[in-house]
Every structure is written in C-alpha cells, then in structure tokens.
Amino acid sequence: MKEYNIASIPGDGIGKEVLPEGLKVLKDTALKHQFKINFTEYDFASCDYYEKHGKMLPDDWKEKLEKHDAIFFGAVGMPERVPDHISLWGSLLKFRREFDQYVNLRPVKLFPGINPPLANKKPGDIDMLIVRENTEGEYSSVGGRMFKDTDREIAVQETIMSAHGVDRVQKFAFELAKKRKRKKLTNATKSNGISITMPFWDERFKEMKKKYPEIKTDQFHIDILVARFVLNPEWFDVVVASNLFGDILSDLGPACTGTIGIAPSGNINPENKFPSLFEPVHGSAPDIAGKGIANPVGQIWSGAMMLDYLGENEASNSIVQAIEKSLSSKENRTKDLGGDADTIKSSNSILSNL
C-alpha cells in the first residue's frame, strides 16, 4: 500500500474550519482507493503563532516541511491583528519562494446546477486552467521608499522577470495545454503600456510556442482579457500570466462561476525538489470566520488537486465527481451559492457522494 506524508496547516480564519473538512474527505478517499495518508498538523503560519512568538514561522520550518510529500494549507491572514504584509510575506510567500513553487495552478469550472452571474452560461462554457508565475514578476519586493512622512516621499517597486523564470512557467503552460482536449493557450500581457517587462514576456512566449506547433495560441492585453473573461469565458482553455495578472485572473475566473469559495489552487514545484502546497483561493475571510458557514469546496477540491499531483488520478477524479454531484442539489450548497447548508453539511454531502 502506498503511503504519503502530508503536512497540514490550518492557519487563520475559515482555514481552521474548512481544512478539517478537507482532511475528512481525503482520509475517506484514501481508504476507498487503497492508499494511506499520514497527516502531520502544524500550528505555525498563523496569526495565533505570531502573537505568541513574534514571527510567523519557527526557525526550523523548512526542515519540518521539506520531509513531506506535499503541504495541505487552509488560509493565512487576520489583518486586524497582524498586518497582511507581515503574515503573508512571513509564511505563504516564503513557502512559495524557498520551495521554488514557481507555478500557481488554478482551475476554473462551472459545475452543473450552479447559476452563474453571467447570463446564458452553462456547464462546459467555463472550464479553464490559469497558470500564474509564482516567484518573481510584480511581486518581487525589490525597491524602497525615500523621504518618508514628507511631501517629497516616493515609493519605488520593481518588476523582476528573468528568462529562466518566464521560460519555465510558460513551458509548464504549454505542456499542460498539450494534455487538454482543446490544446489552446492564451497569453496574458500588457505590452502596449508596460514597455519593458511585458514585451520581454511576449518575446519569450513567441519563442516558446515554436516548440509546440500543435498548440493553438492567442494573446490579449489584460484590460480586454478581463472583459473577455466576463463576456466570452468559453473562449479560454489554458491561460498563462505573470504573477500580478495571474492573481487577478484567477480570482475573476471563479467569480464568473458564482463564487471564489469553490476555487482551488496548487503552488507547484514541478521538478519535485520541494513539496508543493495546495490551498483554496478564498483566503481567511475574517468576516465569516467562526460562523460555520464557510464553503468547504475550495479546500476539498484543493485536496483533489493534491492527489492528482501525487499520482492518485482516479482518487482525485472521484472527489471532483462527488463535488459535482453534491453541488447539483441546492440543499448541499452554502450561502454563497444560494443554499442554506453550513460548512459541515456541505462537506458531508460530498463525502456521501464519493
């Protein structure tokens, strides 16, 4: 029997509520598909930990986590207690960079039974993968401030794009498109306004696509691309984007399906030199934390992505199918999807449909 060692980190806010539901589904799936998952829970990467220790992570966090096959993460951030730039840069963004999780993969799919906010869209019309560069770009944190607290104050922050960094994420996107039925890849850019880094990104894309003649490609500037996500989401199959643009698109995409509460993501190191991390897109949602109404689907679907990454494809598919079946009934949906189910009832319905 195969065994996998997984680090689980609930984090903050609704992460503490939805992560246990994800674990419940993963454990049951493992039993049904005859493999074993050993979970080790960690209390760091949370604002509770920060308030006790004055930092988000222990000094030996890397040694603790790198022995695991993957990391299953809830959410981080309670801005009223710890500023976001401290909580995020001190935990999640540190994981991404030091474990070289240079791909952020976010599926976007409209499930049967869900009424999306977009008119006349049905299941099959919205089914795409967004590939976001995850370790450099606009979020490189290179820059500084001068003349603080004066009328001369200035702030400068640089975008860093390397040939190595751009090529590897674009290659991942092309390889992903190659496995998809439509074999189509869209490049997100803004080279008509950002005159140095985005033309460089586009040049690398043009060179990379020469290696993949079987892949159909197109390109949109980010301003019209967000409009097309709303007007014509069926146009898109795989979309590759820089760190900032990918961040925007991968929140907009799930919103077009009805809620970001169901959206999963993977922070992936494709070479498996380090563990990859899987988390829901929705964040810690302090406004609903503790109420028991958070949508658990994003966490559960992230678990399915983790199983797929580990090679348990059949088990992964069984979870996605159970989600589809569960969400087709209004009674199993949480409030953000127009239902009345609480977190536990929603996850139990998925469990019963496995």
What are these regions (language model features)?
Residues T135, S141-R180, K184-N187, S191-I194, ...:
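Glycine-rich phosphate/pyrophosphate-binding loop and the adjoining helix
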Residues A7-K24, T29-A30, T150-D223, W235:
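Glycine-rich phosphate/diphosphate-binding loop of Rossmann-like nucleotide-binding domains
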Residues Q34-P58, F229:
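N-terminal beta-loop-helix "entrance" segment that forms/cooperates
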Residues Y49-D149, E153-V156, L244:
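N-terminal glycine-rich phosphate/adenylate-binding segment common to multiple enzyme folds
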Residues G22, L26, F205, Q299-L307, ...:
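Buried hydrophobic packing segments
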Residues K2-I6:
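Extreme N-terminal starter segment of soluble prokaryotic enzymes
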Residues Y50, F229-E331:
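Glycine-rich phosphate/nucleotide-binding loop
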